[in-house]
């Protein structure tokens, strides 16, 4: 055990996700020896985020204002909503530059073991957005894992009754990948989702 | 890119050692969603460490006072000094409970590529400590790698002329290890350092 303040810092750092005891110690000693100005900037960055960053009241994405910059942007197509699990996923989709609609961040995926049911997600807010009739398509872009698939199925069934086009991101071989190393589920999906080679 | 504050936090976190862009993003979102009280504690821990923690004026170990708790402890044998590279190493030696002397933290190891020569280490402070004649043995416990070995050799040669017993930690097979998997240098050292099996 180190003396008071150092050990306390190691403990606090060790509570962060993906930071084990050894990393916490290394980070603590880095902080200890780092330039005080750099550490002041780090502390301010944490404080600012906690004080200023909120979640967009419409889509749930992170923002420093009432609405996020995508919901504020009049050039974004309001008739298509891409439903994702986390704010991080918004950025991932944005990087593709192939989606010009709006988003809806659920805040997670259905995961009964972790106690996350549909009520814990921002599904009610999604239904509210559908009320004005402007939305024509919902693209479900949850993670292609157990929880994401369960959430997608739940949403698809629920939205079917409303009569809106509901689509799901294609599953298949990753571009640049190797067919030989694809797992059987992915390869199976690639077969199911095969497309006309001439189109 | 995220909006201002979030991206700034990701950038600051990404500057920490061992934190890549993905980890920085994950940490930033954890901080964003975490309990404000927890984050306040983290910020306070960083601030406190930067404000309060100093280096012991005698041995260079981390401390919140003028002298570290080992240098302050009258039960520690003042005639033996264990020379280590970092404060972390003090803790590692302390955990063995087999050393009851004092320490001297060099603050690194000789590494010409990184621009660290003997002048950048706390070697002058070590020589000052030897002046009072109370010290009878110096145990060099630098890391068993290239830089640590170079530092050990440098110190051993320098201290030889002063006429103090200078020892180096034994190299050999790690306890609980497997002879078959030991690298040839370690195994070679284990042969060189072999001891009478009956002693």
Swiss-Prot record, chains A, B:
CDD domains: TOPRIM_recR (cd01025)
Zinc finger (C4-type): 56-71
Gene Ontology MF terms in the entry: DNA binding; zinc ion binding
Signal peptide bounds: none
Pfam families noted in UniProt: RecR_C, RecR_HhH, RecR_ZnF, Toprim_4
Keyword Zinc-finger among UniProt keywords: yes
Domain Toprim: residue ranges: 79-174
UniProt cross-references to Gene3D superfamilies, sorted A to Z: 3.30.60.80, 3.40.1360.10, 6.10.250.240, RecR Domain 1
Biological processes, Gene Ontology terms: DNA recombination; DNA repair
Keywords (A to Z) from UniProt: DNA damage, DNA recombination, DNA repair, Metal-binding, Zinc, Zinc-finger
InterPro entries: DNA_Rcmb_RecR, Rcmb_RecR, Rcmb_RecR_Znf, TOPRIM_dom, TOPRIM_RecR
Family per record: Belongs to the RecR family.
Known function: May play a role in DNA repair. It seems to be involved in an RecBC-independent recombinational process of DNA repair. It may act with RecF and RecO.
UniProt-recorded name of the protein: Recombination protein RecR
Organism, scientific name: Arthrobacter sp. (strain FB24)
Gene name, Swiss-Prot/TrEMBL: recR
């Amino acid at each position: 055990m180190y003396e008071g303040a150092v050990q306390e810092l190691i403990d606090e750092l060790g509570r962060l996700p993906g930071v084990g005891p050894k990393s916490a110690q290394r980070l603590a000693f880095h902080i200890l020896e780092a330039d005080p100005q750099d550490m002041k900037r780090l502390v301010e960055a944490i404080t600012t985020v906690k004080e200023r960053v909120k979640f967009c009241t419409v889509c749930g994405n992170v923002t420093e204002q009432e609405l996020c910059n995508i919901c504020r942007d009049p050039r974004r197509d309001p008739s298509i909503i891409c439903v994702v699990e986390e704010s991080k996923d918004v950025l991932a989709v944005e990087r593709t530059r192939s989606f010009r609609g709006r988003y809806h961040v659920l805040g997670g995926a259905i995961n009964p073991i972790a106690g996350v049911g549909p009520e814990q997600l921002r599904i009610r807010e999604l239904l509210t957005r559908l009320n004005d009739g402007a939305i024509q398509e919902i693209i479900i872009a949850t993670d292609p894992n157990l929880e994401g698939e369960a959430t997608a199925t739940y949403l698809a069934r629920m939205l079917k009754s409303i009569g809106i086009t509901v689509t799901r991101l294609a599953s298949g071989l990753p571009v640049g990948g190797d067919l030989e190393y694809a797992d059987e589920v992915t390869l199976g999906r690639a077969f199911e989702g095969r497309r006309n080679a001439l189109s």
